[in-house]
Curated annotation (Swiss-Prot):
Known catalytic reactions: ATP + H2O + 4 H(+)(in) = ADP + phosphate + 5 H(+)(out)
Membrane association type: Peripheral membrane protein
Marked site (Required for activity) residue numbers: S379
Location in or out of the cell: Cell membrane
Organism of provenance: Roseiflexus castenholzii (strain DSM 13941 / HLO8)
Name the UniProt record assigns to this protein: ATP synthase subunit alpha
Length: 526
């Protein structure tokens, strides 16, 4: 027999609930129902108040102990289409979906330094949970013109060819573009390794890469001590297109936190961040997959119509802030993979038009042993020149033109049997400069050493050194400058040479080293 509670009993229960602090206020929850699901996309009815890019929750149920989240991307007349972040196989027709009233956010701040996380900011390195209470929306409007400052501080990549001819400044967006296996990632990783002790937090975002390749990159960063100031965001090829799509935005949010609020590295506050997107070609492919699954109309090469906005809203968030807003910076190095050296394809031309210059790496140069395989004619930096130190600017002013002319003359010389003395001398000097600019991976070179070596090459000091001895002469000159004239390197590094460059010490050191080098038997044999 069913018992019915009396009015007095109900009243006593209500009083008890009030004493225990139970919230009896009614809550409005926007709830929907899955009407169709497949390939990582769910179609949901009943979410009339859903916002664009809102985070949706698929609550736990039998067989699923944790909630699954999605992002509302298509707001249609009778339904909402959402991409599912995570395992969508457990989601079925008829499942409940809750609105959260917020957009997707990523954890940010000090606790992420040295960690490897997925696109949602969850740790995947086996080092335990990330202890942070700071979160930022992954999507955000880029800083306005009033908050920005012109680029005037260099990012030293440690790669002599780039620092001299295509300089990068803090707050710049510099594209690294080329075919597969031309050294694009190597340039980015060398740049990260070279930031040790330079007050820069680095973020490496792997999009659509193989897991083995990402693990190898992490091992290199740990080996060279770069993980002490680096965050790795990984959305590998084995993960869903939805996670690959949001990964660069999550990494950018982490970089913006450094730029605006700073972190502590080696006891010093750091407000400069460098972010590498490796690569945005695979990011565009992931977004194309998501868009086609959402039934959005395809355009050129089957990409959706807003694929330009996909990358422009990401890369515009790189900035140099003025002193009123903290003076921090976020420098972006996006990577694009071309097919058969075609830089005029859809995605490459989009990103070239967004960025402040590009570093173009060429397959033929790479196969010829010229590494980094930099094509000087196509590569350019639109703003980084203002960030070069005086000493580097003084030695590199002519270098790019000389190298571009050398490549043209070298191509012409293949078909010409008789060359005049001036042309021959120009080609021979260009060959020596080409050797000077060669550099092995994982061996970034300090600024002061770059300046001395370039000065020797540009001013003809190496004209009598055999080409196969240039590498050895470089290393011996650097060692001599370190031991005999350390004060010169310090002056170059601190940008104190002013108009005295080149100092007499640099000239005398090069001449002394050249004289000693000529006396060696190996020189004569060369």
């Amino acid at each position: 027999m069913m018992t019915v509670a009396t009015t007095e009993e109900l009243y006593q229960r209500l009083l008890k609930s009030i004493r225990e602090g139970v919230d009896l206020q009614p809550k409005m929850v926007n709830v929907g129902t899955v009407i169709q699901v497949g390939d990582g996309v769910a179609k949901i009815s009943g979410l009339e108040q859903a916002m664009a890019s809102e985070l949706l929750e698929f609550p736990p149920k039998a067989g699923r102990s944790e909630p699954v989240f999605g992002i509302a991307l298509n707001l249609e007349k009778d339904a909402v289409s959402a991409i599912i972040l995570g395992d969508y196989l457990g989601i079925e027709e008829g499942d409940q979906v809750n609105s959260t009233g917020r957009v997707i956010s990523a954890p940010v701040g000090q606790a992420l330094i040295g960690r490897v996380v997925n696109a949602l900011g969850q740790p995947i390195d086996g080092k335990g949970p990330i202890q942070t209470t700071k979160y930022r929306p992954i999507e955000r409007i880029a800083p306005g013109v009033i908050t920005r400052k012109s680029v005037d501080t260099p990012v030293q990549t440690g790669i002599i060819a780039i620092d001299a001819m295509i300089p990068i400044g803090r707050g710049q967006r510099e594209l690294i573009i080329g075919d597969r296996q031309t050294g694009k990632t190597a340039v980015a990783i060398d740049t990260i390794i070279n930031q040790k002790g330079k007050g820069m937090v680095c973020i490496y975002v792997a999009i659509g890469q193989k897991r083995a390749q990402v693990a190898q990159i992490i091992n290199f960063l740990e080996k060279y001590g770069a993980m002490d100031y680096t965050i790795v965001v990984s959305a590998t090829a084995s993960e869903s297109a939805a996670l690959q799509y949001i990964a660069p935005y999550a990494g950018c949010a982490m970089g913006e936190e450094v730029m605006e609020n700073g972190v502590i590295i080696d006891g010093q506050e750091v407000r400069d961040a460098l972010i590498v997107y490796d690569d945005l070609s695979k990011h565009a492919t992931a977004y194309r997959q998501v868009s086609l699954l959402l039934r959005r109309p395809p355009g050129r090469e089957a990409y959706p119509g807003d694929v330009f906005y996909l990358h422009s809203r990401l890369l515009e968030r790189a900035a140099r802030l003025n002193e009123d807003y903290g003076g921090g910076s976020l420098t972006a190095l996006p990577i694009i993979e071309t097919q058969a050296n075609d830089v005029s394809a859809y995605i490459p031309t989009n990103v070239i038009s967004i960025t402040d210059g590009q570093i173009y790496l060429e397959t033929d140069l790479f196969n010829a042993g010229i590494r980094p395989a930099l094509n000087v004619g196509i590569s350019v930096s639109r703003v980084g020149g203002a960030a070069q130190t005086r000493a580097m600017r003084s030695v590199s002013d002519r270098l790019k033109i000389d190298m571009a002319q050398f490549r043209d003359l070298a191509a012409f010389a293949q078909f010409a049997s008789d060359l005049d003395a001036t042309t021959r001398a120009q080609i021979e000097r260009g060959q020596r400069l080409q050797e000077v600019l060669k550099q092995p991976q994982f061996q970034p070179m300090p600024l002061e050493e770059q300046v001395v070596i370039l000065f020797a090459g540009i001013n003809g000091y190496l004209d009598d050194v055999p080409i196969n001895q240039i590498g050895r002469f470089k290393s011996e000159l650097v060692n001599y400058m370190r031991t005999a004239h350390p004060e010169v390197g310090k002056m170059i590094f601190e940008n104190r040479l002013d108009r005295k460059f080149p100092s007499p010490e640099i000239r005398s050191a090069i001449e002394h080293m050249l004289k000693e080098f000529k006396q060696m038997s190996t020189f004569a044999e060369g």
